[in-house]
C-alpha cells in the first residue's frame, strides 16, 4: 500500500511525509475557513475548488488511485474527486460545526452521500454529525487519536520555573491552546483571579499564539489581566515549540474551552506527562478525563462553581499526584498510538479493492 499526499502549502509536514516514504504534491485545496463565509469568499472558494478538482483528478488518474482519504471536513474536493471517479472515500472528521446552519446541513448531507465511512475523533463528534440529519444507518465510526506516551514526561523539570524565576513553592497552573474566542483564554484568566485570591503562590501560564485573523484578541485578554490586577500572576508565553518541557513543570493542566473541543490532543499530552487535568465538561474532554479519577470536569460558564471544584486539587499535592498517575495509565491503555494506527489501517484496507 503506497500513499500520495496532497498538502496546500510547503512546510514541516512535507518532510515528515517524505521521511516515511509518501509522495507529496502541493495543491491549493480550497480549504473552507470561517473567513470565507461571505458572498465574495464563497466565490473565491468556488474558483479554487474547480482548480483543485481538476488538479486532483489528473493526479488520481496518473497514480491509478484506489481510494481517496480526506483529513478534515474543511476540504470538500476529495469527496468530489472520489465521486466523479467512482473511488471509495474515507473522511476523517475533526470538527464540531453548529453554525452557520446551512453549512452544517451541507456537510452533514455530504457525509451521508459522499463517503463510504467517516472517522470521528470522538464520540462527541460522531453524535453531533449523526444528529444533524436524522436518518438510520450511520456511516461514521469513532477512532480516538493516539499519542506515544513515552515521548512525554522524559524532559528535565525545572526549565519553566527557572525561566520565570519561580520556586518550588509556587503552584503552576497552565493552559496550552491557540488564541480564539472559544478556546477559553479569558475564562482561564477569570479562574486565575478566583484561585489567586485564595492561593497567592499560584501562577498561571498561557501558551499558544493566535489563529490568523484573531490577533486582536490579545488586547482583550491582556486588558482583562490588567483589570483583575493579575500582571505577573498570569503569564502569556505565546507560541512555544518546547511544549513537553513546559508540561513537565505544570502542577495542573487546564483546558478551559467555552465551546465543545472535538478531541484536544494536548489533554492527552498532559495526561501522558502525569499531570492532573481540569477540563470544561463538553466535547471530547469528557471522553478523556475521568472525573474524580484523572482530574476534574468543570462548567464552561461559571468560574465560581469551577473554582469550588478545582480547589481541592490546588490545595492537595497528593491528590494531584494520584490524578496524574491515573491519567498516564489511561493514556497508555486507551489512547496508544499503536492502537490508533491499527484501527485506521484496518478501515482503509476494508475499503480498498481486493486484488485480482
Regions found by a protein language model. Name each.
Residues 171, 175-197, 204, 304:
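A conserved mid-protein helix/loop that constitutes part of the nucleotide-sugar donor-binding site
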Residues 291-292, 296-304, 312-318:
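Conserved acidic donor-binding segment of nucleotide-sugar-dependent glycosyltransferases
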Residues 124, 146:
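Carbohydrate-associated surface elements
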Residues 159, 305, 312, 319-334, ...:
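A short, well-ordered alpha-helix in the C-terminal region of glycosyltransferases
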Residues 12-18, 205-231, 319:
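Short, structured helix-loop element that forms part of the nucleotide-activated donor/catalytic region
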Residues 276-279, 289:
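Short hydrophobic beta-strand element within catalytic cores of glycosyltransferases
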Residues 213-218, 231-240, 246, 296-297:
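Active-site donor-binding acidic/aromatic loop of nucleotide-activated sugar
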Residues 153-166, 221-223, 343:
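A short helix/loop element that forms part of the nucleotide-sugar donor recognition site in Leloir-type
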